[in-house]
Amino acid sequence: MTERDYTTFETIDLTSEEVLQCSYSNWSKLFPGKTFPSKIIKPLPSTFLDYLASESIRLPSNTNNKKITVLEADSDNEYSDWDDEEDQQQDAEHNDNVFSQFQDIQDKIDASIQEMGGAVFTKLNWSSPKDAKWIMPGNTIKCQNVSDVYLLLNSSDHIGDDLDNPFSEVQKKKTIPEKVDYELVLTKWQEINPAYEFRVFVKDHRIIGISQRDNNKYEFLQGLKSELNEKITQFVEDHVIPKLKSDTQLSKYIVDVYVSKNDIYIIDINPFSRKSDSCLFTWVELLDKKDKHDNHHELRLVENQNFAKEFSESQVPIEVVGATMDTEAMVELAREWDKLQAKEK
């Protein structure tokens, strides 16, 4: 094997400060009118963060569910449920006690949802729970009440990573802060066309690539490719790059944008790291663009239909999805799981 056969794994010098500057509240305030209306709830108490990080899914008892069902993983990663009335009553009391510890957060979520028209989508500092939309009726991240918000946040691996490993890609571990000021972001729900969502990669204050975000093929985009490239490039070069260059220390980052009929909106700004999806590029391709004077970049669109489901690594069999919509079905699913585990022992 010759030297040409090897691909050098190039590290990305990501700093903890870059990660923090990509926290929603830090960058969104720089772009008034260029983001969708949002409410930021912070600081978040440790009791609320512990609730999000727990291995059980608990929802407030003042929902429409007449019966509270709580599934918890034990040390063997097996699941059990409570059948008798006494256990259910005890669990209901514990459930109420858990939520009473951050009732003010729940009240703020309720108020924010109402203020923004009755529907929002949610995220923490960096990630949204898109990977957990399978658990919601209608396969959506649209939240219309507190329980929707809690269910998505509790079920998301992306949110878990925000809580447990926000600085995992930072090389200089000694610079990592001991404490993170977490925030809950509630953004007014928008009916958007996923075909017009794009991811822009910026390095050394210049665009090095633009990619379609949705993994479906849209024939009509091919005819708009040149126009979209021009519009997105102009927006990022005129608004995003100059502002982040003057007001932050960011020189590399990833910008998610939505191209509407009359404007372009910033959906998110992410750290420039392999933890972020490189979409239709490879990280080798992106990191190979080292000439700071080369302003040429490519916009890539999906050319072949992709039948793989997005976030499939975070999804579960259809029986589980059905169970999430029916508490009795969820209990029955837990019983069947225990029976299967017992047979294997």
Curated annotation (Swiss-Prot):
Q: What are the annotated GO cellular component locations?
A: cytoplasm
What keywords does the record list, in alphabetical order?
ATP-binding, Chaperone, Cytoplasm, Magnesium, Metal-binding, Nucleotide-binding
- Residues at which ATP binds: 123, 126, 128, 130, 188-189, 197, 199, 213, 256, 268, 270
Question: Which InterPro entries did the record assign?
Answer: CDC123
What gene name is given for the protein in this entry? CDC123
Q: Does the keyword Cell membrane apply?
A: no
Please provide the Gene Ontology terms (biological process) for this protein: eukaryotic translation initiation factor 2 complex assembly
- GO MF terms held by the record: ATP binding; magnesium ion binding; protein folding chaperone
**Could you identify this protein by its name?**
Translation initiation factor eIF2 assembly protein
Q: Where in the cell is it found?
A: Cytoplasm
Which positions are annotated as binding Mg(2+)?
268, 270
The entry's function note states: ATP-dependent protein-folding chaperone for the eIF2 complex. Binds to the gamma subunit of the eIF2 complex which allows the subunit to assemble with the alpha and beta subunits.
What the entry lists under Pfam families is as follows: D123
- Keyword Phosphoprotein set for record: no
Give the similarity note.
Belongs to the CDC123 family.
